[in-house]
Amino acid sequence: MAKDDVIEVEGTVIETLPNAMFRVELENGHTVLAHVSGKIRMHFIRILPGDKVTVELSPYDLTRGRITYRYK
């Protein structure tokens, strides 16, 4: 997936799922299934329910995404 093809949106983590997956509610009300990007996993950044995050969505599958940033 090329970097210029992604759609970046903000959302809130609703629940934590197994295998580092999260259910995220976007600002527009949609719910997506998101996994953690490699840099966040590498630096052991914890993501908990209620955290505000930035999610990258592929234009081909808008139900899945990648968490790229957790706001402080």
UniProtKB/Swiss-Prot annotation:
Top-level lineage group: Bacteria
GO molecular function: ribosome binding; rRNA binding; translation initiation factor activity
Signal sequence segment: none
Function: One of the essential components for the initiation of protein synthesis. Stabilizes the binding of IF-2 and IF-3 on the 30S subunit to which N-formylmethionyl-tRNA(fMet) subsequently binds. Helps modulate mRNA selection, yielding the 30S pre-initiation complex (PIC). Upon addition of the 50S ribosomal subunit IF-1, IF-2 and IF-3 are released leaving the mature 70S translation initiation complex.
Keyword Phosphoprotein listed: yes
GO CC list: cytosol
Family: Belongs to the IF-1 family.
Entries under InterPro entries matching the protein: NA-bd_OB-fold, RNA-binding_domain_S1_IF1, S1_domain, TIF_IF1
Domain S1-like: 1-72
Cystine crosslinks: none
Subcellular compartments: Cytoplasm
Residues with PTM Phosphotyrosine: Y60
Coiled-coil regions listed in the entry: none
Alphabetical UniProt keywords: Cytoplasm, Initiation factor, Phosphoprotein, Protein biosynthesis, RNA-binding, rRNA-binding
Description of how the protein assembles with itself and partners: Component of the 30S ribosomal translation pre-initiation complex which assembles on the 30S ribosome in the order IF-2 and IF-3, IF-1 and N-formylmethionyl-tRNA(fMet); mRNA recruitment can occur at any time during PIC assembly.
Protein name per its UniProtKB record: Translation initiation factor IF-1
Pfam families documented for this protein: eIF-1a
Main localization (coarse): cytoplasm
Gene3D superfamilies: Nucleic acid-binding proteins
